[in-house]
Every structure is written in structure tokens, then in C-alpha cells.
């Protein structure tokens, strides 16, 4: 079994999938760290909702966000090795969720104040983390 640590010291750098190294303050590291934070925020929302449909959406989105994080954590060689990259089907999936929500709730004409219930508040936190990741 391999270890999660390398014992080589990092000198302020981290390895990308594919073998190259980048500074830990690079935009890629910041981006995939924020994506990881968004995945965790969605996990909190998942535990707080009772809706099987919302749970299914969240779980699917979390899995695809792991893929997005992997892409951000890859160099060119790593990208060639990755399978199942983020693509048009992922965009369509999200658009379908938005369309269904709009059918049920109508178009939003004003800002929604977070905090109606715990799961809604958690989803708003996740939304803000995702916006930062964008």
C-alpha cells in the first residue's frame, strides 16, 4: 500500500497529476482547493435535505466536481490520461435541473435571503463556494 505522504518535502510546490510540479500558491491549486471545498459544502447540504431528488442531484454533482478538480489538478500529460472529462453532457445535466426548478418555482425576480431552513441555507453556502471556484 502506498502512502499519502512522500517524505520528500515540498519546498512550496505540489505535484500535479501527470508529474509536473507547481507552486502551492498557483491559480490551479487555489481552484481545485475551492472545488474540493464546494464538494464538501454540498455534502453538508446533502445531509440536511430530506428530498431524494435533491440528494440525487447533489451526489451526481459532487462526483462530477471531483472530475473537474482532477482536471484542474492535472498537467497536459495528466489530462491525456484522464477519462470521463467534464463535457457537454455535464452542462446539459445542470441546465435540466435549472429548467425543472424554474418550472416549479418560476423565474426569480429578486434575491433570495438564505436561511429558510437548514438544507436551503447549506445549499446557499455551497452556491457561494462554487461561484468563487468559477
Enumerate the language-model features and the residues they cover.
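Phosphate/pyrophosphate-binding loop motifs in nucleotide- or prenyl diphosphate-using proteins
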Residues: 1-134
Amino acid at each position: 500500500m502506498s502512502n499519502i505522504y512522500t517524505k520528500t518535502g515540498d519546498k512550496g510546490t505540489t505535484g500535479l497529476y501527470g508529474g509536473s510540479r507547481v507552486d502551492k500558491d498557483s491559480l490551479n491549486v487555489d481552484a481545485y482547493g475551492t472545488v474540493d471545498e464546494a464538494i464538501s459544502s454540498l455534502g453538508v447540504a446533502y445531509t440536511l435535505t430530506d428530498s431524494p431528488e435533491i440528494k440525487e442531484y447533489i451526489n451526481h454533482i459532487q462526483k462530477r466536481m471531483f472530475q473537474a478538480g482532477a482536471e484542474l489538478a492535472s498537467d497536459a500529460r495528466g489530462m491525456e490520461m484522464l477519462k470521463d472529462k467534464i463535457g457537454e453532457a455535464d452542462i446539459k445535466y445542470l441546465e435540466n435541473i435549472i429548467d425543472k426548478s424554474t418550472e416549479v418555482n418560476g423565474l426569480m425576480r429578486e434575491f433570495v435571503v438564505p436561511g429558510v431552513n437548514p438544507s436551503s441555507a447549506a445549499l446557499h453556502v455551497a452556491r457561494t463556494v462554487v461561484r468563487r471556484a468559477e
